[in-house]
Structure formats: structure tokens, C-alpha cells
């Protein structure tokens, strides 16, 4: 046994079996030799074979997962049973060691595919990566006569499966630097055929579409479908996209000029349907706070975009039941329909305000026909109270212009104290504070919504005395500048409560004569005092 241990164990063929490695002499011993020596020799050969197998197992590289790659065997033997010289075997060993030094990537069929490896053909984690690295399908390339692999310069069926080294070089050779393969022979992500054993469910549940071939950009089709659905929703629901600022507390600053759609709540009402407009074209919002600027000045720079309430003058009438009209009837109810008709006459509402809140206001007759009513006759209840003078004559400018007939200043219709129901505003309703500034809203409109709570002064006579009104019912104040609105349009929205001058031409009334033509009506620009 000591001699057997001293001898070097012979190398065994990897494809040979232990029975095949026994020499014929030991398998068929001579009849004259001792049987004990034969058994000892057989045991020595079997023991040497086991030691050789253990040594080869230590020298062989660990499996890398590439089943289709060649296995390099260290030693003087190669698969096939042929023996090579020591120099050739050493060269094969060096070549195998160089192949082992290149990065390898594991195959893990039960794990998801490595995203980075699928896109770029490389993975920085190498063998430590816990994901699957499937085989990449290469482009079919026709090799020339001098570029053939193997003996005879042709590709044999045994070399159909490429080595891992060639597959690692494939991304650089075929797809460029870090650009996914978009050739027609592979799918959009560079996967192999759909029948491969790798687990592709996690990366193929979304379908992709190539949107830029040069840059290698891909986009999920789900995003494209979502964009198309959004366009269809916009086209089906309305002809324009919905404004995103309209539903915010600040609203849309463009108002009706906005090119997007303004929807109100789930019902989808547009802004043209949601509010009514008063006679000035301002929105009526009964449930909202009254616009402070509108209540002070009678106008609002925000127009229809204002979020506050702009009540009509008829809606702010006094609640005192003792106030009556000049004919002794009960006060008329406020006309609500006038708010939605901007072209309707605005002075019935203003007349109601003046009758209830402004003292010393007498109704003036209508001069549409150019004649005065008989003395003592009052106009009917449906009288407008204020007639707008036409600005443009119906006849050419060559027609001689006559002055409008004026009523005597002492006409009984202009004597407000004689009209019942028009008494002076009681001091209990509006406080008088001589040391404080005058309430501008009370001076202009004759009404103050704060009443006794107002901290400003409310003079007892906010309008001019009797006899200072023109036939149009507007105050004549020579010491004040001409009302800009009256001089421009011929009307004044404040009526008798206006603090500016509203001049008018007066001349003696002719004894008898035909009615005046429409072209003979005076204009606000043609007046002299």
C-alpha cells in the first residue's frame, strides 16, 4: 500500500467509467499469478481514479449558467478521448481562464428579468444580480468565405449555439452603445421569441411603441390611448376645453373673453345661464354680499366678473308702509323682470327709489309729443317718470331748430310740498352728524343701507328744493359743473339726486301752434342759461 501511495495517480478520461479505466491485465489476470496481487492492483487503480476525480473537480471552473458554452478542462485531455501535447493543453487552459474573467450573468428562470440587462445587454451586478438574464437573440449575419468558423470555413450545426462571450459582445456590435435593439427580427424590447422559457410577464404586460427610431425612445401605448381618450372627451363633451381657473375662488380673470369653457358644477351650466343682469349689465347674486363699490358709486369695474351682488334700485326700497304714491294708492311692487332686460326703461325703478327715500321730488310729465298736460292733471301710474331726449334728429341739419317749450317754474306739478306722501326724511331713520363727513351714497342716491348705524352725516335736504328741477326731472345747479354723464348721453342714472348741473333751454310758451317735429327737439349740447 505504501508503494501505491508514492506513485502519482494517473489522469482519467472524463467520459470514461471506472470499469473502463481498469487495464486489461488487471481485468483478465494470468492464471499463474496470485489472486491476492490482482485484487490489490484493482483497489489501487480504483483509489487513484477517485483521487483524480477529486482533483479535476477542484480545477474545473464553477458552472456559470451558460449551458450552451464549452467546458474547458485543465490537463492533457479534452472531451473526445484525444490527447493533446502539453503546450496545446496549456494554451487551451489560458484561453478558458481569459473567458472566465469576462463578466457573466446568471439565468434565473423563476425570477423577473433584469430590466437594465434587457435594455442595454449589460448588468453591473454581474453574478450577484438576483434577477433573470435571458438569452438575447442576435441578428442573422452571413459570414464570408474567409470569415467562417470551424474547420472548412463553414458553420456546422454543432456551433449553432453561440458562446456567452459572443453574446456579451452583441450589444456593442449590433445595437450601438446602450441603445435598445429595434430591428424587425426582435420585438420592441429586444426579447427572444415569445416561446422562450424566461419569465417575461412583468415586462410584457405593457405594450410599447417606438416613437423615435434614431434616439431609441419607446413609449407605452397606454399613455397614447389615455391622450386619445382625453381628446375624444374634449371633442365629445364640448367644442373647447374646460377652463381650470373658473372653478377656483378667484375665478377666471378673462371672464366672457376666455377661450376655454366655463362650466358651473355637475349640471354643466355655462356662465351665460347662471346669473341675471340688472339694468346696468351687472350680475345679480341675491345670496352674496352687496358690492361695496357699486353701492357707493353706482358702477363696478369688474362688470360681469364681480362675485358680489348688484341690486337694482327698486330692490332697496323703504319698508315703511306709511309712504304712498301721490295718487294715494299703495306703493307698487318691485319689478323683478327689468333686471334681465337691459334695454328696458330704467327710470320706473329709479322713480320708486326717489319716491320712497328722497324728499321734495315731484313727478315730471312726459314730453314725448312736445305738449304740456293740463294743469292739475297727473300722469298715469305707468308713466316712466323720465323721458330720454333723442340725441340725433330725424331730419337733416338744415331744418330750423326751435326751442323746446318750457313750463312755468310755479307749475303746481313742481311744488313738492303739495304732493301727499312726499314728506321730509325723518331724522330717526338717518342720523345727522354735523361734525362728520357727509355720506356720499346718501347724498347721491338719497338712501343709506346702514340707516342709524351709519357713522357719517346725513343732511335733511340731499336734493335741491322745489322749482330747481328741469322738465326732465333733473336738478339745475348753475354753481356746479355739468354732469358728465348727462352731457354725453342726455340721461343721468342718479336722477333728481344727482349733485351736478343738468341745464335745459327755457323759452316762453307759444299761445297756439302745431306740435313740434322730432327734428326740433333740443339736445343736451344746445343749451344756454
Curated annotation (Swiss-Prot):
Q: Where is the composition biased (Low complexity)?
A: 14-31
Q: What keywords sit in the KW lines?
A: DNA-binding, Metal-binding, Repeat, Zinc, Zinc-finger
Q: Which SMART domains match?
A: ZnF_C3H1
- Zn-finger regions (C3H1-type) at which positions? 108-136, 237-265, 285-313, 433-461, 477-505
Q: Which Gene3D superfamilies match?
A: Zinc finger, CCCH-type
Pfam name, any one: zf-CCCH_2
In which organism is this protein found? Oryza sativa subsp. japonica
Q: GO molecular function terms here?
A: DNA binding; mRNA binding; zinc ion binding
- For the region Disordered, give the residue spans: 1-36, 134-179, 313-347
- What is the name of the protein in this document? Zinc finger CCCH domain-containing protein 65
PROSITE patterns this protein is in?
ZF_C3H1 (PS50103)
